[in-house]
Each structure stands twice: as C-alpha cells, then as structure tokens.
Amino acid sequence: MGKLIKLITTLTVLVSLLQYCCEFNSGSISCERTQTLCHYTNPRVWNTYFSRNCELYKNKVSPGFDIVARKYDTAVKPVIDDATVKVNKAAIQPAFKVIHSQCKKWNCGKYYQLVRSPMVKTRRFFFAKYNAFVKPNLDKFFTAEFRSHLKERILKYKNIGHYYFTITSRCIKSKYDFTVGNTEEKLMGKFKNKDTHGIHGSVTREPSSEDMVLTVSTMESDEEELTTTSTQTVVETITLDQEEASAVANHAHDDEASTDVEGSTDVNVNEQALLQEDFDMWSETILQKTQDVIQLFEKDVSKYINGKLVEEANHFKAKFQSLDDKSKKFFSKISLAINDIECVEGIDSETGKKIFFDKSGSTEISQYITRELVREYFNETRSTLDELTNAMEKDLSEITDEIEKKVNAIREENVEVFEEWGDIIVNEWSKRMAYVDVINAHMGADDDTTLDEEKAKSSVNWKKFLKGKKQIIESRDKLAHHSADLSRVNAFRQKVQKKILSFTQESGEFLYILRSKANLQFQERERKERERKEREKAAAEEFQRQQELLRQQEEEDEEDVSYTSTSTITTTTTMTL
C-alpha cells in the first residue's frame, strides 16, 4: 500500500510539473507530440470529458474538482510563479549572461581546425590500411582507366563536400548567434510575456497544410471534438546580406585554393612524411596480420576438432556398446556351461547311448561339460575381447594421426595465405617507395642541403623497408611453427584409452571369477565322481568277497556229499562180503 501511495504521489508531481511547463510555454510549443502529451495529461480536459458523459461524475465529483482548481489558481499558482521569477532573476539570468558571453567568443575556424587534425590522421591511417589490404584486391578487378575516372570523380566530390561543409558551418554559426540572441531577449525580458515568443530575424513563416485535431472519443454522446489545437510548421529562411555573402564566397574561394595547394603538395611533401609515418604502422600491421592469421588458424583447427571429436565420440560409443554386448554374450555362455558342470547322466531308451541332463534333471544338455571345453570357452572369450580392444586402440591412433595431418594441412594453407599477402605487401611497398624516390628526384628542391636530407630519408626508409620484409619472413616462420591446441584431442584419447583399460580390467576380473567358479564346480564334480567310484569299488569288492564265500561254501558242500557217498559204498561192500 505504501508503494502504491508513493507511485501515485510521484505521478501527481510529474503531471503537475508537466502541466506547469505546458502552461508556461503554451505559445512556443511546436512539437505535435508534446502538444498531445500536454493535452491528454491536463486534468481540466478529463474533468470536462467525464462531466459531459457521466451524470454521477458531474453531480458528485466535478463540483469538488472545480473548488480544488479555483484554490490552486488563487493560492498555489501565485506562489509558484513568484518562486519561479525569483529563481530566474537570481540564478538563470546571471548564469546565462556568463554562458552567452563565453559563447560569443566561439570561432568556427579554430574548432574546424581542431576537428580537422584528427580527421587528417584518421585519413592517413585508413589510407595506409587501404594500400595494404584493399588496393591489391581492387587492382585485380578494375582497369587503370576505370581507376583514373573514379579518382577524378572522388576529387570532384571531395571539393564539393569541402565547400558545402564550410557553408554549413557558417550557417550553423549564424543560426547559433540568432538563436542565442533570441533566447537572451526572452530571458532578459518580462518573465511571462506571451507576445515575445515570435522568431526574430529574417525568418519567413509558412503554415503547413496539415493541422492536427486532438479529440477524445465519447461513449454515449454524439459530440466527438472536445478540444481542437492547430499547429503550424515554421520554415526558416536565413537571408545573408551582401557583406556576409561576399565573405562566404571569399572563404570558399580560399578553401578551394588551399585545397588545390594541398593537392599539389601532397606528392612532394605529405607523401614523404606519410611514408615515414606509415613505416611505424607497417610493423603494427604485420603484427596484427600475423595475429589475425594465427587466430584464424586456431579457429579453423578448433572448428575441425570439435566436429571430428563429436563424430568419433558417437562412433566409439557404438563400438563400446557392441563390445559390451559381445562380452555379455560370452560371459552368459560360460556361466551356462559352469551351471551344467553338475549334470545328471542318463541312458537314451531308443539308442542306448548316454545322455546328460542339468542338475535338476529336467533339461537335456547338448554335450558333457569338460575342463577342456570350458577352457576353450575362456580362451575364445579372451582372444575375441582382446581383438576388439586392440582394434579400437588402432582406430584411436589412426584418428589422432588423421587429426594431426589435417591440422598440418590447415597450417600450410594459412602459411600460403600469409606468404601471398606478404608478397603483395612487399611488392606494393617497393613500388610506392620507388615512386616517391622518382618524384623526389624530379620535383625536389634545388638546395643541396634539402637534397641530402631527402636522400638520407630515402636511405632510412629503404632500411625500414628491409626491416619490415625481414619481419614478414620471421612472422611466416612463426606461423609455420605455431603449435595447435590439441588438448581436447589428447583428452579424448586418454578418455577412450581409460575406458578401454577399465573394460579390460573388469572383463579380466569377471573371467577370473568365472574361472574360479568353474574350478570349484569341477572339483566338486570330481570329488563326487571319486566318491562314486570308491563306492562302486567297495561294492565290487564286497560282491567279489560274497562270491568267494559262496564258492567256498559250495566247495565245502561238495566235500560233504563225497564223504557220505564213500561211506555208503564201503558199508555196502562190507555187507556184501
């Protein structure tokens, strides 16, 4: 609630200040949007509008609004007007006198020279850049005739632009003096005099054909126009007297003459000075070009490596997935064989051959699981996984070699571009220096001292040229040996190798566990087989012992029968005798 009250208070203050400014400057506001803003933020306008369209507002609110408006006009507004007059007399007018006295001393010519000096330096800088980068390419596409014609047109428009720039600066100064004088009269006169808002001087008013009618659409009434405000566009025509016109013409003539003099001395004086200044920028240009080529090389390498690594990452992801699937398949095969080590032997009722079932005895297995068979499974798994991981490492090495070859190709391409640029730059600079030497030889001064100075400058310039040429060669060697950033490639390689090593260790550990489990199963089966054989052997020995006992018993029985028969025969014989 407090924030809402602050917002309402702020809006009220802003609207009040706006309305005061609108009322104070009601005769000098020419902007249609400002008039519209003043109109639609005026409380009196809205009071009239709501009074016409709402009976409740007309009867309940409008009388109170009229009372507040009258109190504002009688009690508040006079106080504000007096305070404004005092502030104007005590602060604004003295400050304006000081500012106006300083502004009267303003000289367009000095400021023109002040602005022209950095513009000349900028022109020289762009001229050097143009000769270094743009001109060699333009010479390939445009003929000498076309360039000569274009140069004439540019020189013509340059003189025209210089003339109009001078005229414009004069007009701006005249406009400034006129505006400042008008404002001074307004501030120094009566504080609020609506008759002093006219435009003084040689000014012609031409009303525009467009008038803006500000209306507020009604809700239920047929009256659409609430307030109509007409605006006019003032067209200012500045008329110069004969003296001012002749002064402008003379100044323009002097500018044209100075332009001709500058044009005639550019080759003889400025070209030599410009050449000496440009040698300092040439070194910076070579360094900048070297940095640009290196940045372009690094950008191309980074772009290629990013795309290549994304592509290869997807390929290796598929390879690791295939490796994982195959390893699971082999591990499942070995685990199933280990579970079938403890099998049950049976006899086929049809063929009479031995058949084997799992330990539950419900599922027939394809073959009897032996140590040799399980060992073969382990060897097959180990060899297959080793082949797959070795193939992945080989692919990784090939990818690294491919990236290095591509990076070297990109480097060679950028080196060739820099060499071509360097050849063009050296050629253009040699032509330019030879041209300056020829011009100095034919247009130089007759004074021997000046001639010696020109020769010394030429010698220094040629030494600087040789230094710049060596700098280009050194920059070329620097670019040729600039190492590319392969940290992401190395990180990718280490990541893949680490993953391969991790898979190899995990698969080896799992195979070791399976091998141990298989050994335990085989040992258990062999123990049971030994026990079974011992039981069978014991049973066989017991059976043999029983057979031996039975045989002995039979022999004893046979002996008893033989004795009885002998006794009977003896008795019979005796009785017969």
Curated annotation (Swiss-Prot):
Signal peptide from the UniProt entry: 1-23
Alphabetical GO biological process terms: sporulation resulting in formation of a cellular spore
One GO CC term, this protein: mitochondrion
Organism: Saccharomyces cerevisiae (strain Lalvin EC1118 / Prise de mousse) (Baker's yeast)
Major place of residence: mitochondrion
UniProt gene name: SHE10
Subunit (UniProt): Component of the mitochondria-localized RNase mitochondrial RNA-processing (RNase MRP) composed of one single RNA encoded by the NME1 gene and at least 31 proteins. Absent in the nucleus-localized RNase MRP (NuMRP).
Keyword annotations of the record: Coiled coil, Mitochondrion, Ribonucleoprotein, Signal, Sporulation
Protein name: Outer spore wall assembly protein SHE10
Family affiliation: Belongs to the SHE10 family.
Entry coiled-coil feature ranges: 379-416, 513-561
Low complexity: compositionally biased ranges: 562-577
Residue ranges, annotated region (Disordered): 525-577
Localisation: Mitochondrion
Function: Involved in spore wall assembly. May be a component of the mitochondrial RNase MRP (MtMRP), a ribonucleoprotein endoribonuclease involved in the cleaving RNA transcripts to generate primers for DNA replication in mitochondria.
Biased composition (Basic and acidic residues): 525-545
